[in-house]
Curated annotation (Swiss-Prot):
Binding annotation for [CaMn4O5] cluster: 367
A GO term from the CC aspect: photosystem II
Record protein name field: Photosystem II CP43 reaction center protein
Positions carrying Phosphothreonine: 15
Amino acid sequence: MKTLYSLRRFYHVETLFNGTLALAGRDQETTGFAWWAGNARLINLSGKLLGAHVAHAGLIVFWAGAMNLFEVAHFVPEKPMYEQGLILLPHLATLGWGVGPGGEVIDTFPYFVSGVLHLISSAVLGFGGIYHALLGPETLEESFPFFGYVWKDRNKMTTILGIHLILLGIGAFLLVLKALDFGGVYDTWAPGGGDVRKIANLTLSPSLIFGYLLKSPFGGEGWIVSVDDLEDLIGGHVWLGSICILGGIWHILTKPFAWARRAFVWSGEAYLSYSLGALSIFGFTACCFVWFNNTAYPSEFYGPTGPEASQAQAFTFLVRDQRLGANVGSAQGPTGLGKYLMRSPTGEVIFGGETMRFWDLRAPWLEPLRGPNGLDLNRLKKDIQPWQERRSAEYMTHAPLGSLNSVGGVATEINAVNYVSPRSWLATSHFVLGFFFFIGHLWHAGRARAAAAGFEKGIDRDFEPVLSMTPLN
């Protein structure tokens, strides 16, 4: 089997397990990659690579539509979303579809429509993917030069980057439009326990919006994850959408400067590594967001955050024991600190006991009971509303703890419900995906840099044991 020198020079060439098998006419002889290396065989075939990408998009959208309809079919309106293993309906509910005051689902039809629209879209994408993979032109450069490209063409690559940025900016503005004009979004902070509302007074002050980026990531500071009102959140999307669109126009109209041409490796595998690095950051950030933030991910749909469930337990027992006659302002716990209430390091009144570590939690069911110096003793004695008691008792028994075999809840809480919170699933999956994408970033960055430096040879195959073995077929 003769492998071209040019292919040996630029790609590592894998030893075939089965020399006779060639998928879609793409064999190792012509591409330098075996069938199991997937889309690497299409590096220089822009038309076929387009087919692979469109088909991949079709699979993603098909999963979204099918899973959406599956969740609608299994949905029980009487139970909270987070108790039903739902991971898609909470997102639709957060966007304000189908829900009313308190996050109660009043109409599942919008969820059905969403699923059907995704299925129809996936059919169109699937057809396009099959067409471009099997029937369309192998390369686009000759027939459709606008869609064609060469990986080393720096100007074309930044133009493609610009188009992607504009599409991301449009996506950010779609959320802004939904919040402003198309029915609003669900606000967990709305008075009385949350409701859908239109966001009128956007926060557009650059010092406020970009101040989040400059915050410490630790404790009550919480970097961008600490955003706790929708005016800031939607205003941030206005800024982000504007930056993406303006940046996209900039990259379309300009050519890379000399320093950028020198600093970057300009090859397909290098672009893959940059993309994986960016997605890794997105994954880790999303993990922190879904775990700690109950504004973008309302607890009514995703279940309480860990700190929220812990504080809810302290609150529930404060309410119970206060009714039984305990003086919650002065009762001492076993360590000599306050049993129900104590002071934080900075002097605020906070819940006592083990939940003291979560003293900087903010939650809509708890904030009305705070005064200028933390929890207000008078409000705790006279102003606690039934909805606050109900919600904290519910959250106390639904801590976002759990394992892969679905044994969830606090081990020591006898009333805990055995379930796994969507928060656990979303945070864990995004951490794991972010981690593996980071490893992929390192792997492909190393290979791309080696190829650019000219020492990408791969393993010497001449004396490899597998070459003397009988072929599998």
